[in-house]
Amino acid sequence: MHPPAAGRPETIDETAAIVTARGGRGIAVRVDHTEPEQVASLFERVGELDILVNDIWGGDDLIEWGKRLWETKLEDGLLLVDRALKTHIITSHYGLPRLRTGGLVVEVTDGDGFYYRGHFFYDLVKTTVIRMAFALSQELKDRGITAVAVTPGFLRSEWMLDHFGVTEANWRDAVERVPEFIASETPLLLGRCVAALAADPLVASKNGRVFASWDLADEYGVDDADGTRPHFVRWLAANMPEVAAGMKRADDGLYAYWGEMPYRTPG
């Protein structure tokens, strides 16, 4: 079994308790999602599904920012593919047969476009996850199941708070060093956006596409834990326009090139 990514102190039991505290029923199950047998066993226990969210990452300690492919540690790059892409494939393989008609598949990525993300393996994983949602939308449409990809903005995760040496209580102290952190969001915002997608009777109209938390929050009227509604790209456009200009989101022009092959391959 792989060790916990980046040695994080948080536990699955704590996560389950948070789910229960918010009105759900959190059930902690220890599973290594790189191991097909463990994932298969998990879904045998679960039974039927209404929604499947693939959000496994585990790459914070594997990215060598500023280095090109041939300069990176190959073993770290391949491990990142195992953790952040292979896990999604394995989980979908065993989970998708259990989705009910009208169900929803959500792939969580970083960014809602196909611009270069600054590192070969990071870019490979995050753009492939978007494409996975599209491919699944094609394979699931005859079952009445919708597949989308979603991205948070500047995520104020536990790892990021530790990285900047702050907590959720005083996170604004990091803004002087990292101005764009003022537009950050907690993981709760994207979770609320996913819940809104799952409750939308017209969610099938979004099939196969990628959506950002800031756009979904505006569309569904969703706020973050503190009642604010962060809009990362809007902040960038106002304060770092040269950065925002390079973050072109996937639009109708791009999707016009995506579609099912007009023929079937032999066999």
Residue ranges and their predicted role:
Residues 1-48, 57-68, 249, 258-267:
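Short-chain dehydrogenase/reductase
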Residues 13-17, 21-24, 164-179:
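A short C-terminal helix-loop "cap" of Rossmann-like NAD(P)-dependent dehydrogenase/epimerase domains
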Residues 24-25, 48-49, 98-111, 142-146:
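Active-site loop of short-chain dehydrogenase/reductase
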Residues 58-62, 68-80, 102-142, 151-167:
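Catalytic loop of short-chain dehydrogenase/reductase
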Residues 89-93, 134:
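A short, exposed helix-loop element centered on a Lys and neighboring polar residues
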Residues 149, 169-267:
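C-terminal helical subdomain
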